[in-house]
């Protein structure tokens, strides 16, 4: 049963934004957004790629390319901002490549609240509805490409002894199904 809930990729984007506000200062981030909109949008597009196809294991390190315009907005003081932040042990910055390096655990924290809410909603659905006959679940949509979300859902399905189907291209699965149904109406 498809359902739109307010705990998808946008909430993860909000956590990402908040991380940079905490790290570099909300005023500077707002200035970057207002004065360098193209770079700001590109910065979040790149995060979208990391979010969907990013690391699948906790051993990996995450690299985030900082746009030159953001670096300039901060008056080249990113290392100092990091050293004064609560993230000083989890984040470092390479001035030559303009890359912020963070451990996987910190990256995973962007998803914590979203995962908690999705899990809670699924458990509530099982409790409120008679879903004891459900033996298979289908995970589709762009957000389901994210390894962190996949792992959380896989773990929950395993607990509930439900077989999980994850198509090769989950972001396109709904579209492909709609096109197929439109061309072969008796397929439903």
Kindly give the residue locations of the regions a language model identified.
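Short beta-alpha connecting loops at secondary-structure transitions
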Residues: 2-5, 30, 159-166
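Conserved phosphate-binding/catalytic loops in two-lobed NTP-binding clefts
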Residues: 153-177
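Active-site catalytic pocket residues across diverse enzymes, especially alpha/beta-hydrolases
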Residues: 20, 153, 157, 182
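Gly/charged contiguous loops adjacent to phosphate- or pyrophosphate-bearing nucleotide/cofactor binding elements
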Residues: 4-152
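Conserved A3 ("GATE") glycine/threonine-rich loop of ANL adenylate-forming enzymes
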Residues: 6-14, 168-182
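A long, glycine-enriched binding/interface module in the latter
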Residues: 37, 171, 188
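A polyampholytic, Gly/Pro-enriched intrinsically disordered region
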Residues: 182-188
């Amino acid at each position: 049963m498809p359902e739109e809930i307010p705990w998808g990729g946008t909430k993860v984007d909000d956590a990402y934004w908040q991380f940079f506000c905490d790290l570099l200062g909300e005023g500077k981030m707002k200035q970057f957004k207002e004065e360098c909109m193209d770079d700001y949008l590109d910065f979040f597009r790149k995060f979208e790629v990391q979010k969907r196809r990013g690391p699948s294991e906790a051993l990996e390190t995450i690299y985030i390319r900082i746009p030159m315009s953001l670096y300039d907005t901060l008056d080249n003081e990113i290392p100092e901002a990091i050293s004064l932040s609560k993230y000083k042990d989890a984040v470092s910055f390479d001035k030559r490549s303009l890359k912020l390096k963070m451990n996987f655990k910190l990256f995973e924290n962007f998803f914590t609240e979203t995962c908690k809410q999705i899990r809670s909603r699924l458990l509530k659905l099982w409790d409120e509805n008679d879903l004891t006959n459900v033996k298979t679940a289908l995970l589709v949509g762009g957000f389901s490409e994210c390894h962190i979300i996949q792992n959380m859902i896989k773990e929950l399905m395993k607990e509930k002894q439900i077989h999980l189907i994850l198509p090769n291209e989950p972001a396109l699965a709904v579209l492909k199904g709609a096109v197929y149904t439109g061309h072969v109406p008796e397929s439903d």
